[in-house]
């Protein structure tokens, strides 16, 4: 069987943290001549996003239990049985050579049926604390891969698959050494915005003397951009070249590479991307993340002196202003170098190679 006739089924859904690394691997496999089919939830973000990438989909209806009411919990056995039956149908139609589970509730019924039907299963856990589905499915998988060491027992540390352009940036040493003048600060609130960052950062910058202030790019999400502008105006910033407020950033690789410091949440993909680029970061974990996984994600870099971790409850304008005063481009460059040293920039290729191996393909098919 040639590589062009081999098929990978990717199971992932629910959030971008599962879908985007799955897409990175999917495109890598397609580039090697593989057929890729995606298994997802018709109500999930993957149903809109994945077809835009030209990848055909199979659908299974299944959702999570966390925070759901009694009715959802009582109907779980029926919903799980239906999802298993739908998954089996998809597996029979697609007949994949290997199934890659990238996380999300959808992976549980599909992963179980893949194992029971004899389809080799590869799992990848993006977070530093494994989700329930992957904890169970790890017992049935041929290979278990993790983005952070220790997330699952007996797993292989591959890192998180990321977009290729993030791994192609100049070294931190070259970037930081070429700069002069005020520091370049990137604040990333994400598509949903991060109210704590949007409120504290403008007030912290106002506490700095004009000569101490960095140049700022602050991304806040389309729904929060007006409130962010009001926060900066209330802090005494009338706009101008030194502060740029944007609802979204299309080219995150360039934005990270242009920054001396990033202030952001610590989702798994954010941490992995920052390490891949090699940029200093101050992480403020989302305090309501499942199992507080954002704290342990950030700790992976912070414990190595490659980032700073501040809990949201401890974040204040005064604390942030004092910390910014204590930093120099040289100190941030050192942090960025440490971050880059912990990155796994070849994660996409490595996960692709492992999938090929499990399917019985030659490694040369993934170049």
Curated annotation (Swiss-Prot):
<protein>
    <recommendedName>
        <fullName>UDP-N-acetylglucosamine--N-acetylmuramyl-(pentapeptide) pyrophosphoryl-undecaprenol N-acetylglucosamine transferase</fullName>
        <ecNumber>2.4.1.227</ecNumber>
    </recommendedName>
</protein>
<dbReference type="Pfam" id="PF03033">
    <property type="entry name" value="Glyco_transf_28"/>
</dbReference>
<dbReference type="GO" id="GO:0009252">
    <property type="term" value="P:peptidoglycan biosynthetic process"/>
</dbReference>
<keyword id="KW-0997">Cell inner membrane</keyword>
<keyword id="KW-0328">Glycosyltransferase</keyword>
<dbReference type="GO" id="GO:0051991">
    <property type="term" value="F:UDP-N-acetyl-D-glucosamine:N-acetylmuramoyl-L-alanyl-D-glutamyl-meso-2,6-diaminopimelyl-D-alanyl-D-alanine-diphosphoundecaprenol 4-beta-N-acetylglucosaminlytransferase activity"/>
</dbReference>
<comment type="pathway">
    <text>Cell wall biogenesis; peptidoglycan biosynthesis.</text>
</comment>
<dbReference type="GO" id="GO:0005886">
    <property type="term" value="C:plasma membrane"/>
</dbReference>
<dbReference type="GO" id="GO:0005975">
    <property type="term" value="P:carbohydrate metabolic process"/>
</dbReference>
<keyword id="KW-0132">Cell division</keyword>
<feature type="binding site">
    <location>
        <position position="191"/>
    </location>
    <ligand>
        <name>UDP-N-acetyl-alpha-D-glucosamine</name>
    </ligand>
</feature>
<dbReference type="GO" id="GO:0030259">
    <property type="term" value="P:lipid glycosylation"/>
</dbReference>
<comment type="function">
    <text>Cell wall formation. Catalyzes the transfer of a GlcNAc subunit on undecaprenyl-pyrophosphoryl-MurNAc-pentapeptide (lipid intermediate I) to form undecaprenyl-pyrophosphoryl-MurNAc-(pentapeptide)GlcNAc (lipid intermediate II).</text>
</comment>
<keyword id="KW-0961">Cell wall biogenesis/degradation</keyword>
<feature type="binding site">
    <location>
        <position position="294"/>
    </location>
    <ligand>
        <name>UDP-N-acetyl-alpha-D-glucosamine</name>
    </ligand>
</feature>
<keyword id="KW-0808">Transferase</keyword>
<feature type="binding site">
    <location>
        <position position="163"/>
    </location>
    <ligand>
        <name>UDP-N-acetyl-alpha-D-glucosamine</name>
    </ligand>
</feature>
<dbReference type="GO" id="GO:0008360">
    <property type="term" value="P:regulation of cell shape"/>
</dbReference>
<dbReference type="InterPro" id="IPR004276">
    <property type="entry name" value="GlycoTrans_28_N"/>
</dbReference>
<keyword id="KW-0573">Peptidoglycan synthesis</keyword>
<dbReference type="InterPro" id="IPR006009">
    <property type="entry name" value="GlcNAc_MurG"/>
</dbReference>
<keyword id="KW-0133">Cell shape</keyword>
<dbReference type="GO" id="GO:0071555">
    <property type="term" value="P:cell wall organization"/>
</dbReference>
<keyword id="KW-0472">Membrane</keyword>
<dbReference type="Pfam" id="PF04101">
    <property type="entry name" value="Glyco_tran_28_C"/>
</dbReference>
<keyword id="KW-1003">Cell membrane</keyword>
<keyword id="KW-0131">Cell cycle</keyword>
<feature type="binding site">
    <location>
        <begin position="15"/>
        <end position="17"/>
    </location>
    <ligand>
        <name>UDP-N-acetyl-alpha-D-glucosamine</name>
    </ligand>
</feature>
<dbReference type="GO" id="GO:0050511">
    <property type="term" value="F:undecaprenyldiphospho-muramoylpentapeptide beta-N-acetylglucosaminyltransferase activity"/>
</dbReference>
<dbReference type="InterPro" id="IPR007235">
    <property type="entry name" value="Glyco_trans_28_C"/>
</dbReference>
<dbReference type="GO" id="GO:0051301">
    <property type="term" value="P:cell division"/>
</dbReference>
<feature type="binding site">
    <location>
        <position position="127"/>
    </location>
    <ligand>
        <name>UDP-N-acetyl-alpha-D-glucosamine</name>
    </ligand>
</feature>
<feature type="binding site">
    <location>
        <position position="249"/>
    </location>
    <ligand>
        <name>UDP-N-acetyl-alpha-D-glucosamine</name>
    </ligand>
</feature>
<comment type="similarity">
    <text>Belongs to the glycosyltransferase 28 family. MurG subfamily.</text>
</comment>
